[in-house]
From Swiss-Prot:
Name of the molecule in the record: Putative gene 41 protein
Top-rank lineage group of the source organism: Viruses
Length: 154
């Protein structure tokens, strides 16, 4: 398959929890404790795409326009059934249409995130020299919908 100018190829696994294809975001009914929208580095997007292609196994392919600015939409929400417990989300969204998500993770472990840990996560997601797979492993559990190509140490 040939690449078009200003595009990178992205792979989607049908029915997978990792949600690697544009989808509509649902609105949470839980209270949002913290929310940030930070610009995503081109290097991180390319690394995500390369990982998806390398481990695609013939799945459906879509194109991502590299001339568009993408953002990490970070959210920390209160898990209402258990007070004091939280869930945190990271979604890769398009700057022109933030309701469409291209990559999504949700950590439902209920672990609280301190302000310092949140700030460090934001900084690492904006740093092009950081390894995106390592950063995601650091802040999200393996059962958060992590794609299989982001390997966790056994």
């Amino acid at each position: 398959m040939e690449k078009l100018p200003n595009t990178v190829v992205k792979v989607h696994g049908e029915g997978m929890e990792s949600k690697l294809f544009p989808r509509k975001l649902h609105k949470d009914t839980n209270s949002i404790l913290r929310e940030d929208l930070v610009s995503a580095c081109q290097e991180h997007i390319e690394a995500l795409v390369e990982g998806m292609i390398a481990h695609g196994d013939g799945r459906k392919v879509a194109e991502l326009d590299t001339s568009t600015q993408y953002y990490w939409h970070l959210k920390l929400v209160e898990y209402t059934p258990i007070p004091g417990r939280t869930q945190h989300y990271v979604d890769l969204v398009d700057g022109t249409n933030p309701d469409v998500c291209y990559f999504s993770l949700c950590d439902c472990s209920g672990d609280n995130i301190t302000d310092r840990r949140w700030s460090n996560m934001v900084k690492r997601l904006q740093n092009p020299e950081e390894d995106i797979a390592k950063t995601l492993r650091c802040y999200f559990r393996q059962d958060a919908g992590m794609p299989s190509w982001i390997e966790y140490p056994q």
